[in-house]
């Protein structure tokens, strides 16, 4: 038979023992904390264990990161907005310029080519026309000029070229009138070879526009051209 009195007494003893143990444990930790044996919890851990909605004012962070001046914030916003506007304007301008360059007008295309009437040019004379901002020499050569141009030994030339490679019609020589040395304009019907002479540094070109003497490294450049009719020349 079960003795309820004995069980109740045992339960009381157990409960009292647990209370004593709990009190001993709590008191032991408290005394250990007071004596410095248990370190303080880090602030982050303490904040998690004891959450609070109170705003803590940190004077140290306030000194390191002072609040901004409203006028300065407005100025920074103004500068940032203005910079974005300028950047967008530049991008728009570049795109517009690219589109316009891709669709050249008739005036631009007309300047890219030049039509010349050759009927008024006498044999043995040279005329100068302007094409793309550069002078172009057009010489109507005589039979003697043609024979002289074809009698040159190519081995003696600095920039070897046959006369036939530089003309489309033996009677007409078309070259850009810019010295290949430093860009001066040579004088026609001058020099030691009856062609052109550059007064800047003394380069001599023959009747085919080939460099024969002086510092120029290359012959006078031959532009792109074609004959529209017998007396019509299209440069470009």
From Swiss-Prot:
Keywords: 2Fe-2S, Disulfide bond, Electron transport, Iron, Iron-sulfur, Membrane, Metal-binding, Mitochondrion, Mitochondrion inner membrane, Respiratory chain, Transit peptide, Translocase, Transmembrane, Transmembrane helix, Transport. It catalyses: a quinol + 2 Fe(III)-[cytochrome c](out) = a quinone + 2 Fe(II)-[cytochrome c](out) + 2 H(+)(out). Disulfide bonds join 184-200. Its EC number is 7.1.1.8. Binds 1 [2Fe-2S] cluster per subunit. Coiled coil: none annotated. Component of the ubiquinol-cytochrome c oxidoreductase (cytochrome b-c1 complex, complex III, CIII), a multisubunit enzyme composed of 3 respiratory subunits cytochrome b, cytochrome c1 and Rieske protein, 2 core protein subunits, and several low-molecular weight protein subunits. The complex exists as an obligatory dimer and forms supercomplexes (SCs) in the inner mitochondrial membrane with cytochrome c oxidase (complex IV, CIV). Belongs to the Rieske iron-sulfur protein family. This is Cytochrome b-c1 complex subunit Rieske-4, mitochondrial.
């Amino acid at each position: 038979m079960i003795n309820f009195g004995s069980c109740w007494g045992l339960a009381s003893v157990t409960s009292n023992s647990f209370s004593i143990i709990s009190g001993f444990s709590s008191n032991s930790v408290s005394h250990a904390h007071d004596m410095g044996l248990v370190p303080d919890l880090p602030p982050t851990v303490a904040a998690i264990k004891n959450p609070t909605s109170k705003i803590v004012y940190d004077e140290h962070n306030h000194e390191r990161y002072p609040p901004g001046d409203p006028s300065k914030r407005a100025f920074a916003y103004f500068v940032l907005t203005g910079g974005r506007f300028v950047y967008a304007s530049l991008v728009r301008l570049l795109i517009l310029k690219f589109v316009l360059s891709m669709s050249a007008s008739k005036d631009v295309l007309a300047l890219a080519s030049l039509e010349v009437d050759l009927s008024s040019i006498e044999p043995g004379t040279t005329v100068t026309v302007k094409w793309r901002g550069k002078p172009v020499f057009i010489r109507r050569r005589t039979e003697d000029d043609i024979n002289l141009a074809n009698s040159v030994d190519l081995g003696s030339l600095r920039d070897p070229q046959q006369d036939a490679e530089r003309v489309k019609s033996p009677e007409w020589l078309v070259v850009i009138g810019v010295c290949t040395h430093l860009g001066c304009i040579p004088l026609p019907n001058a020099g030691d070879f009856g062609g052109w002479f550059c007064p800047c540094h003394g380069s001599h070109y023959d009747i085919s526009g080939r460099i024969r003497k002086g510092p120029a490294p290359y012959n006078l450049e031959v532009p792109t051209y074609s004959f529209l009719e017998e007396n019509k020349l299209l440069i470009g």
